């Protein structure tokens, strides 16, 4: 089994340099770090993270707080975070808040009181701004990922959900649809509220009426989408198009309408949000709003470890954009946003 001296010899550096890469990577140039990491991978060398953690008063673990561990987009985010953490020799503790703010607070309380982790990544946190500012005083590195917050000096990677909702409605409007419905997440998650705000903004700019009877809350699931579609069809005048706030529900809407002899998109157009894999496997293929979930995870983890490894670290904000993916479920159109 390889040891640190073997790695130093293969990389052409001193043992002290290898030790700095492992324990204080911020003090070593990126080129040197990458070379050492590559040699470590080639030699299958794994540092003794427990011993290092004891020496440095570190746990060599981070926590990831997710609103829903079954959500495909959150799984992609987790994959990006875990990939970076693994390269750094860190474990990732997964905490599922189930879109419950109190449960999220309980997790944070346990993590902070016991100093069980060296940092935390919070995806679409339900905490209020004042609570996040209070968290800063705990001297525990953390990163906010997902929806935009009006906070200063916070490590964050944001997704513009409002723009995503705006893109969705704008695309449907550009295809000539006037009566447009919206199926939202029943949990009233803040990111879904932002999507709805963008949706309403696009309708207002085009002087289109917002039909309350076409606005339906549903569970973020196949069952939720099915029930919402059923309710939509009970209306005397069905909407011409529907924007669904998540792809699983959108796919369920598509299936239900098809089974009730509604032709997509000729009778009703459907547009989702997330761009999960199944959107390309149904017929017609689902148009959707995509966001770089995996990249969000990667960048969030990098920000967190930069903070953990550097005492003089200054917080950063990174903004990622949504993208309209045009397929067949809305009809033919060449407009992209």
Regions found by a protein language model. Name each.
Residues 1, 42, 80-93, 112, ...:
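Bacterial carbohydrate/catabolite-sensing allosteric modules
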Residues 1-60, 73:
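N-terminal helix-turn-helix DNA-binding module of bacterial transcription factors
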Residues 17-20, 54-70, 171, 179-186:
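Short beta-strand segments enriched in small/hydrophobic residues
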Residues 45, 101, 123-128, 248:
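Short beta->alpha connector loops
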Residues 127-136:
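Active-site-adjacent beta->alpha loops and helix N-cap segments on the catalytic face
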């Amino acid at each position: 089994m390889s040891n640190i001296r073997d790695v130093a010899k293969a990389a052409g550096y001193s043992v002290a340099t290898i030790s700095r890469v492992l324990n204080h990577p911020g003090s070593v140039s990126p080129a040197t770090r990458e070379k050492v990491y590559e040699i470590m991978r080639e030699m299958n060398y794994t540092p003794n993270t427990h011993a290092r953690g004891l020496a440095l008063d570190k746990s060599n673990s981070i926590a990831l707080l997710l609103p829903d561990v079954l959500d495909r987009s959150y799984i992609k985010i987790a994959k990006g975070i875990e990939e970076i953490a693994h390269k750094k020799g860190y474990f990732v503790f997964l905490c599922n808040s189930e879109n419950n703010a109190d449960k999220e607070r309980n997790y944070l309380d346990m993590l902070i009181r016991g100093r069980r982790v060296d940092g935390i990544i919070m995806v679409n946190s339900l905490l209020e701004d004042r609570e996040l500012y209070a968290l800063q005083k705990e001297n525990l590195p953390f990163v906010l990922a997902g929806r935009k917050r009006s906070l200063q000096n916070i490590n964050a990677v944001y997704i513009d959900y409002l723009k995503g909702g705006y893109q969705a409605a704008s695309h449907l409007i550009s295809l000539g649809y006037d009566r447009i419905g919206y199926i939202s997440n029943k949990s009233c998650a803040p990111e879904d509220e932002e999507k709805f705000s963008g949706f309403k903004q696009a309708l207002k700019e085009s002087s289109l009426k917002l039909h309350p009877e076409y606005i339906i809350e549903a569970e973020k699931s196949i069952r939720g989408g099915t029930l919402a579609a059923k309710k939509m069809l009970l209306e005397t005048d069905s909407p011409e198009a529907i924007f669904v706030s998540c792809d699983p529900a959108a796919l369920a809407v598509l299936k239900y309408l098809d089974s009730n002899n509604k032709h997509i998109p000729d009778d009703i157009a459907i547009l989702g949000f997330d761009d999960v894999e199944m959107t390309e496997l149904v017929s017609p293929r689902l148009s959707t709003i995509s966001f770089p979930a995996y990249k969000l995870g990667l960048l969030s983890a990098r920000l967190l470890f930069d903070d953990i490894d550097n005492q003089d670290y200054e917080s950063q904000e990174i903004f990622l954009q949504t993208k309209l993916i045009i397929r067949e479920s809305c009809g033919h159109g060449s407009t992209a946003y």
